[in-house]
Amino acid sequence: MVFQPISEFLLIRNAGMSMYFNKIISFNIISRIVICIFLICGMFMAGASEKYDANAPQQVQPYSVSSSAFENLHPNNEMESSINPFSASDTERNAAIIDRANKEQETEAVNKMISTGARLAASGRASDVAHSMVGDAVNQEIKQWLNRFGTAQVNLNFDKNFSLKESSLDWLAPWYDSASFLFFSQLGIRNKDSRNTLNLGVGIRTLENGWLYGLNTFYDNDLTGHNHRIGLGAEAWTDYLQLAANGYFRLNGWHSSRDFSDYKERPATGGDLRANAYLPALPQLGGKLMYEQYTGERVALFGKDNLQRNPYAVTAGINYTPVPLLTVGVDQRMGKSSKHETQWNLQMNYRLGESFQSQLSPSAVAGTRLLAESRYNLVDRNNNIVLEYQKQQVVKLTLSPATISGLPGQVYQVNAQVQGASAVREIVWSDAELIAAGGTLTPLSTTQFNLVLPPYKRTAQVSRVTDDLTANFYSLSALAVDHQGNRSNSFTLSVTVQQPQLTLTAAVIGDGAPANGKTAITVEFTVADFEGKPLAGQEVVITTNNGALPNKITEKTDANGVARIALTNTTDGVTVVTAEVEGQRQSVDTHFVKGTIAADKSTLAAVPTSIIADGLMASTITLELKDTYGDPQAGANVAFDTTLGNMGVITDHNDGTYSAPLTSTTLGVATVTVKVDGAAFSVPSVTVNFTADPIPDAGRSSFTVSTPDILADGTMSSTLSFVPVDKNGHFISGMQGLSFTQNGVPVSISPITEQPDSYTATVVGNTAGDVTITPQVDTLILSTLQKKISLFPVPTLTGILVNGQNFATDKGFPKTIFKNATFQLQMDNDVANNTQYEWSSSFTPNVSVNDQGQVTITYQTYSEVAVTAKSKKFPSYSVSYRFYPNRWIYDGGTSLVSSLEASRQCQGSDMSAVLESSRATNGTRAPDGTLWGEWGSLTAYSSDWQSGEYWVKKTSTDFETMNMDTGALVQGPAYLAFPLCALAI
């Protein structure tokens, strides 16, 4: 049966790029296999189904999976069905089935209308509509069947060819289910990295004390790559928290890999620990944490393109589920060797059998975090098999001949035969022992080599047959490498050096001589027989190379069997000296050394070491370059590097010295180093200090005062700030000879302090007036920068004006007060200065003061009164005048009465008594605490007071009168006067 697409493509264009989002569900071979498996399992579960559906309605309206259900299905979106038929009672289950059937019946018509509309929106052919109807029917049956058993999770990805690559399907089916125990199976099939994997598992879950504990085992089968493994897992769940641990163990060995040519593969053994948690207060927000590790030499934990040895990874992520239908999240995966990747997740969790409204309800999210709705969740494990890879042996090497035996110096050709799919890039030899013994192995081509046997080695033992054989046997190993980087097996070439009739030994005397053409190196060759006895009179041909002299001589050995050569050279390097006698050859390396530049013999200097950074003044940098013998070295490629400033052109003086000027317009310290032939030269570096011009430029410098006005109190200060800048715009630090000169009233200037960007001092004074201050450096007066500071008198209360009198401020005025009593405070000897202050009273409204310093008393006071004048120009300065009255004065009436009546009226007015004579007047105006002495005639303050006589008392029974106009006391009887009452306060 062939399933046809049920709708056509939807083309979406965005920003000039075309992106196809498939609306078509086309089941391929994998889906057909899965359907068949589900149908077979369905037959076995029919009995169980009848048990749970015994009381259900016999006919349930099918729920159609139409094309509209998949219109929003993009790659990596998941449709999840979680139906738990075994967790509820029969009555509850029947009610749920009926309710679901009603919901499905209500939505079926809409689904069919959308499905039909999608089909008619296609090409319009009748056959396409028919095929789509068949596809709808199949989808309807699959979904209805899945709704009956367990939990299914489908992840369908469709590419432009309608294949199901990177798709997956998992299904958990409960076989035995009770309130506290669940036995289930889980079937899964998936496609990832072009591999189809089948997962078969069984498990149990049990509920104890609010925790769900589970064990499971899985068989994982890579159907495409023929890999098999078994998995063991454990679970521990509770509300809002899920913990899991899994182990994975391979069941098959190495076999050819389908991912890499020339590689084998097998499952990697490993395991993981997983945790998923959700916030009870905010169940929409969840987090995950996973640790996984696998063992092996080349394990593809981060994909087949990132193979690692014993890799591990830690994954941390957060997710947010605003409604049950949608989950978004981000995972950060970090592994070995700084491997990391970020995964953004968008998951559609469509629960088949539930209304669409419930899946868009935020309040439904909390229930999905509880055990009641999660006991049928799929097992949390890695269903994809992690693979380990191993390089295959694809190149085979053989050597011809495989063994060589000959005399010293004999030459043999060695041929390499290589079998492999790719051409040979090189043959790698392990021939260090042969080369060290004096033999050579020279390539003629990639696979052909000339081998020259080394000298024969003689041992010192008397019986040395076996030792000689061992000492002159060499085992050379070779392996071939093709252009793909593949290496062959190692092949061994056995080399035996036969004993010659004569032997040659060499000794070098004076090696490492200078290559000056004068100093010689002596090489002595000793010729001996097979027993090591020196042979005299043997002709030895000695040759040299690399331009040495002589280049060839023939010498006869002396009585000690020694032939000598003394060679010189003007070319440094290795000179090979070779001696030959009767077919025997012996070579030895000699070394001529040309003097090389030496940092410990060379010097670097800077003159001068401190200059002004004006871009004109220069420090001369000089290098004296010498070799190891202390000789000057001219003509070298010398460069100076500086960390600051500009280095001029280097001049070679042809005597081993090199110099260049260094200038700068930037302040700081320049460090100069040397390079020779582009490489760092370790001669000690030198430093040059670029400073500012010590003479400040008036046009660029600045001079400021923090405030131009201060009080002449010796405390308030103004801060002077001088910023000296030279003509190049540089701040001058460490300035010497700086002072601030003054002209005007005398002031005190503190010592000058250097700040990071200025020079500061403070000014205070005690004399009012103006002073001008000018910065001066030595004899240079910067008159254009001078500033003026004005010193003002300290605010002072100088007098109290009371009814024509000016009282001193220290006499405690007033002691007596009355309604509408007024006086004026005088600031700085003139009431005209009162407007320069802000006035306030501490006892308002009884005592008030205006902006002229006029104080008015409207009612009696009960404590000390403070009248404060705050300077408007210097708000931090204020002056307060304080007084504490002790008598409140009041006229007992406006009628003339007798002394007895006056006493009665004062007492009747709640006054203590008639004012005592001693508190009434002394006959003179003075701040003496008497009423008339302080205030004079009270008629000047209010019309409530009358001119004439007022009763006062000398004693409690002896009365006399006081004239309000003159303040005079009149003794003797008086018949009528005004009452003058007083209340102690």
UniProtKB/Swiss-Prot annotation:
InterPro entries (alphabetical): Big_1_dom, C-type_lectin-like/link_sf, CTDL_fold, IAT_beta, IAT_beta_sf, Ig-like_fold, Intimin-Invasin_domain, Intimin/invasin_bac
Chain spans, region D5: 887-985
Paired cysteines (S-S): C906-C981
Region span, D2: 595-694
UniProt keywords, alphabetically: Disulfide bond, Repeat
GO-annotated biological processes: cell adhesion
Region (D4), start-end ranges: 795-886
A GO CC annotation given for this chain: cell outer membrane
Described function: Invasin is a protein that allows enteric bacteria to penetrate cultured mammalian cells. The entry of invasin in the cell is mediated by binding several beta-1 chain integrins.
Protein name, as recorded: Invasin
Organism listed in the record: Yersinia pseudotuberculosis serotype I (strain IP32953)
